[in-house]
């Protein structure tokens, strides 16, 4: 009786918003999610499961990707103690759709540099955006410095309308409504690096080599871009890692060489600190040294292991199909909230890759016994040296990358596994003839 009374008292303490929450997978009630859109940047964009979209019937699902809500009573007397402060309202990933609070007016076009095959698609896309949709198009300054674009007189009138920016110098985070990438997976990673806070929706066209993260084909770009502008598109929120590198104070020359003079430099008790948003992975390796790397890995302040080998990869589910997959990690769907820890050629027969909850904080430091320094890179960029006393703190960022889907998050992912990585491709075994089966 006392336990039941305590449970009733705790239930009454829940706020009205908390009490109104129902899991659509368990209760079949979609009204709550329709009336409570997940908001993005103010006055620009949002995600919702709005039934007003033209293709609503195409994306409604009978089951949530989150799975059913667990029953929290166990046997006749036991139950889980309810804590109102830990209740989270999370929308079903299968129902996330892009919608606009106001019509989009500006678009950032990211083109793979020094690729002549992309010049014609780039020109066609920009002309369509400017002349047909009256969009303000942003491009990186070095894109317009391409000799093929400079020498094209027919493209001159359009080129004058571009808004240009320079990486690491100009902040365009509040000017861009959505992003279009032309190239391979690297263009999407580059787009992520440009936005260290909220990221505009990204539409990625497969015009590169691999294209696991770029699901759109360019042949029908006009109709596909129109759907995005109209707000009729499925979206997958690709989680990113928030990485903070804290370094012991050293001479000024070394600090600048290590990239610490860039935007984001901070001081922390006399130490130097930088923060990055990472879409794929953080890689800590032994660099040019011939010795094994020797780094300690902490989880929420507790030492869990010491990595002795070529290094360690800390990746998002999106990054699980990149370097981590080559190192033997499992491929994890981007909607799974998790962080992967994968050793690189460990000098151990029992060091297997692990998956930890998305909410933990990992901290990586050189072991006191380490014979050499280590090197760290973030999505293959900003590579720098890590010495004794330096630390790398990693947790899930609150700023995901909203990637626009062709169909839906599940279908697109398995399509990429099949088409790009040729997952489980094998010649099928032939069946026995009927006469052999009878014998």
Curated annotation (Swiss-Prot):
Pfam families found in the cross-reference section: NAD_kinase, NAD_kinase_C
Domain of life where this protein originates: Eukaryota
GO CC annotations, alphabetized: cytosol
Keyword terms: ATP-binding, Kinase, Metal-binding, NAD, NADP, Nucleotide-binding, Phosphoprotein, Transferase
Coiled-coil features, chain-numbered ranges: none
GO terms classed as biological process: NAD metabolic process; NADP biosynthetic process; positive regulation of insulin secretion involved in cellular response to glucose stimulus
Residues with the Phosphoserine modification: 46, 48, 50, 55, 64
Alphabetized InterPro entries for the sequence: ATP-NAD_kinase_N, ATP-NAD_kinase_PpnK-typ_C, NAD/diacylglycerol_kinase_sf, NADK
Protein name: NAD kinase
Organism listed in the record: Mus musculus
Gene: Nadk
């Amino acid at each position: 009786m006392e336990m039941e009374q305590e449970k009733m008292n705790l239930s009454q303490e829940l706020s009205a918003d908390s009490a109104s929450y129902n899991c659509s997978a368990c209760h079949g009630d979609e009204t709550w999610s329709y009336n409570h859109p997940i908001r993005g940047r103010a006055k620009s964009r949002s995600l919702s499961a709005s039934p007003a979209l033209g293709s609503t019937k195409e994306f409604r699902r009978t089951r949530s990707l989150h799975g059913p809500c667990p029953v929290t009573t166990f046997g006749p007397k036991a139950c889980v103690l309810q804590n109102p402060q830990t209740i989270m309202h999370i929308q079903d990933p299968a129902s996330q759709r892009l919608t606009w609070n106001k019509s989009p007016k500006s678009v950032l076009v990211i083109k793979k540099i020094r690729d002549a095959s992309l010049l014609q698609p780039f020109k066609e896309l920009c002309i369509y955006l400017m002349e047909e949709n009256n969009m303000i198009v942003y491009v990186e300054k070095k894109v317009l410095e391409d000799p093929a674009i400079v020498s094209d007189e027919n493209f001159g009138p359009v080129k004058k309308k571009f808004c240009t920016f320079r990486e690491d110098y100009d902040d365009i985070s509040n000017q861009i409504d959505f992003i279009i990438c032309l190239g391979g997976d690297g263009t999407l990673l580059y787009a992520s690096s440009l936005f260290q806070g909220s990221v505009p929706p990204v539409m990625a066209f497969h015009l590169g080599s691999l294209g696991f993260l770029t699901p759109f084909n360019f042949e029908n770009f006009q109709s596909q871009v129109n759907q995005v502008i109209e707000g009729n598109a499925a979206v997958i929120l690709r989680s990113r890692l928030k990485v903070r590198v804290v370094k012991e104070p050293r001479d000024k020359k070394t600090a600048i060489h290590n990239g610490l003079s860039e935007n984001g430099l901070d001081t922390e008790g006399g130490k130097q600190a930088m923060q990055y948003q990472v879409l794929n992975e953080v890689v800590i390796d032994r660099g040019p040294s011939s010795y094994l790397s020797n780094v300690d890995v902490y989880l929420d302040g507790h030492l869990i292991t010491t990595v002795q080998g070529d290094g360690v990869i800390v990746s998002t589910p999106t990054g699980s199909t990149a370097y981590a997959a080559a190192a033997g990690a499992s491929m994890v769907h981007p909607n799974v909230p998790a962080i992967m820890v994968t050793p690189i050629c460990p000098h151990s027969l029992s060091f297997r890759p692990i998956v930890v909850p998305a909410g933990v904080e990992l901290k990586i430091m050189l072991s006191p016994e380490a014979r050499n320094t280590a090197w760290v890179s973030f999505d293959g960029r900003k590579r720098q040296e890590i010495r004794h006393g330096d630390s790398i703190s990693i947790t899930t960022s609150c700023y995901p990358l909203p990637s626009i889907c062709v169909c839906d998050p599940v279908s697109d992912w398995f399509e990429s596994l099949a088409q790009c990585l040729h997952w489980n491709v094998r010649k099928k075994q032939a069946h026995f003839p009927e006469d052999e089966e009878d014998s």
